[in-house]
UniProtKB/Swiss-Prot annotation:
It comes from Escherichia fergusonii (strain ATCC 35469 / DSM 13698 / CCUG 18766 / IAM 14443 / JCM 21226 / LMG 7866 / NBRC 102419 / NCTC 12128 / CDC 0568-73). It catalyses: propanoate + ATP = propanoyl phosphate + ADP. The gene is pduW. This is Propionate kinase. It comes from the Bacteria. The keyword Cytoplasm applies. Belongs to the acetokinase family. PduW subfamily. Its main location: cytoplasm. Its EC number is 2.7.2.15. GO terms for cellular component: cytoplasm. It is found in: Cytoplasm. Keywords: ATP-binding, Cytoplasm, Kinase, Nucleotide-binding, Transferase. NCBIfam families: ackA, PRK12397.1.
Amino acid sequence: MSHKIMAINAGSSSLKFQLLAMPEGEILCQGIIERIGLADARLVVKTATEKWQEITPVADHREAVTLLLEQLINRKIINSLHDIDATGHRVAHGGETFKDSALVTDDVMAEIERLAELAPLHNPVNLLGINIFRQLLPSAPTIAVFDTAFHQTLEMPAYIYPLPWRYYHELGIRRYGFHGTSHKYVSGKLAEKLGVPLSALRVVCCHLGNGSSVCAIKGGKSVNTSMGFTPQSGVMMGTRSGDIDPSILPWIALREGKTPQELNQLLNNESGLLGVSGVSPDFRDIEQAAENGNQQAQLALALFAERIRATIGSYVLQMGGLDALIFTGGIGENSARARAAICNNLHFLGLSIDADKNQHNATFIQSEQAMVKVAVINTNEELMIARDVMRIALPEPALQEVLA
């Protein structure tokens, strides 16, 4: 039996969505409502055969969801709201409470709200989206899918920071990790393509986009990941610095009189590829500038690759070897130059890539003599969300082995 599942990612001024037929995974429609709260908000909807957009005032998220549901009916994508069997919502932070996706209840909503102090920019609006869909689709189960849940398998030495113990015990300061839904999806897809159980593999997954993270996966479980207490930490990103010497911050504060809020702005929005290159946070713009001889752009690309290489190396050491390296995300899936730079001179790990396969974005780009598989896999977080919805909200025994 096929079910219609809506996957939702609610942002501060946007609402991304996919309606999928499950368990087939067929996308019935997908799109975004952006500039919510403004008179010129934009709705974009795509199906397999057509695409349309509409510019219209959208006062708030409730109006956005109402507009979306009306469009689905008016365009005959669904006959009525009862056609939507369940909804799945990306939630940025599940803390230590949620080790898996969860059926939303009043208690679950209260806990997501409590955890908003760990993700003040994301959890409140994620919760808002959940609440609106629960009100407008009261008969459809709602599932919260947490970006942090996949990393709850980290052992304590991998997630504790060397700070006074009370900061963890009383305030919950620890490594949480993010991009978990993506890392979970692509590692499972890798095992499927190889015809090998994920439990038998040691994998490093590089989710590289405007936000980037690296994850070590052993036996199908996350054992380390580069993002930490916040998505700001780890490797260099589009506008985020990643890991730096923490004493730089009080030094800058004293030297330039910056407030904590200004320091946060510096680290999150003015650093990374943008900060070093002075060109753009967009990897394509930096690659073009580097090809045109811009030395700062060239340095930014080199630094980006070097930080990722160092992280890969530490994870290989932790896992005692490597069976496969995955590239995913906007940069990982599309930049042959980035993949080549990251894989350069890793022959000692049994890892080398075929230049032609890499240039043409083949699924497997390792050279014939390589011992380590190198895969380029398009992430699909919406499908992973829909699978979790099916597993938790609409369990059918015959499907559980497929969806596991």
